[in-house]
Design a protein with these regions (language model features):
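Generic hydrophobic alpha-helical segments
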Residues: 61-65, 137-141, 171
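Structural motif
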Residues: 33-36, 54-56, 79-81, 129, ...
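A contiguous loop/helix-start segment that scaffolds small-molecule binding in enzyme catalytic cores
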Residues: 2-6, 145-232
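A short acidic, often aromatic-flanked loop/helix-cap motif at beta-alpha or helix-coil junctions
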Residues: 56-62, 108-109, 131-134, 194-198
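Class I SAM-dependent methyltransferase SAM-binding "motif I" and its flanking Rossmann-like core
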Residues: 13, 80, 84-149, 202, ...
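Class I S-adenosyl-L-methionine
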Residues: 1-103, 111, 206-209, 216-218
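Generic domain-boundary/flexible-linker signal
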Residues: 42, 85, 134-136, 162, ...
Length: 232
């Protein structure tokens, strides 16, 4: 068996790919990933054996590569940081290949926090971008709003199943349904961070009702005040 890497390649711009991840990708024999992620690293994977996968065919692809890899190097790139919102896939890679080296990347949540100027240590980071149930995460969202935390939320696009679709509009209706005055909750929605097609919505959570956002969206609810060291 060769060497297997799972790496984060940043939110969309090659400027956000770390040097160590660049070196690993350049040294790969085989690269497997989703189209958007592969597009981020397109200039680094010329001449390599590339597999473009989807949720439906990824298992078949991984199993085939396991048979063929031998002493080669496989790199599986992930958008953003491999350690955030990707555990279901990473866990499966470890089950299939055994020893997988994981190298982190810069996440869209870090970029969103920077643009909104909120500290991560005063924020709750919640990802709905999973295939499993998000009911507990919804309760976590409610509690974070009540407790006054900043919230960085990755919504869940699932247009084929409205019951699972939980984008900014659905978040707004959910909070209102559970008794929150969403007109008083400030929010940013950042779309397509760093990839040259960025758009930003700034307003109240109430104003998100009925609005459509891309799959590449991050919500930031800002609830804390600035506290510099001069205040203490």
């Amino acid at each position: 068996m060769g060497k297997v890497f799972a790496v984060g390649v940043g939110p969309g711009s090659q400027n956000y790919i770390t040097e160590i991840v660049r070196k690993v990708i350049v040294g790969a024999d085989v690269v497997v990933g989703y189209k958007y992620t592969l597009d981020i690293i397109s200039s680094l994977i010329q001449g390599k054996k590339i597999h473009v996968i989807t949720m439906e065919d990824q298992e078949k692809t991984y199993q085939q590569i396991k048979k063929e890899l031998e002493g080669g190097i496989l790199v599986v790139p992930f958008t953003g940081d491999v350690n955030f919102s990707e555990s279901e896939v990473v866990d499966r890679l470890i089950e299939i290949f055994g020893d997988v080296e994981i190298i982190p990347g810069i996440s869209s949540i870090q970029v969103a926090a920077s643009k909104a100027k909120i500290p991560l240590d005063k924020s709750k980071v919640i990802t709905m971008h999973v295939t499993t149930s998000i009911e507990e995460k919804k309760l976590e969202l409610q509690k974070a709003v009540v407790d006054g935390y900043n919230i960085i939320l990755i919504p869940r696009p699932w247009p084929k199943d409205p019951k699972k679709h939980f984008m900014p509009s659905e978040v707004a209706f959910y909070l209102k349904k559970n008794g929150f005055d969403t007109s008083k909750i400030p929010v940013h929605v950042f779309e397509s961070l760093t990839n040259g097609k960025e758009q930003t919505f700034t307003g109240s959570v109430q104003e998100l009702e009925g609005k459509e956002f891309s799959d590449l969206s991050v919500m930031v609810i800002s609830q804390t005040r600035s506290e510099s060291y001069i205040s203490f």
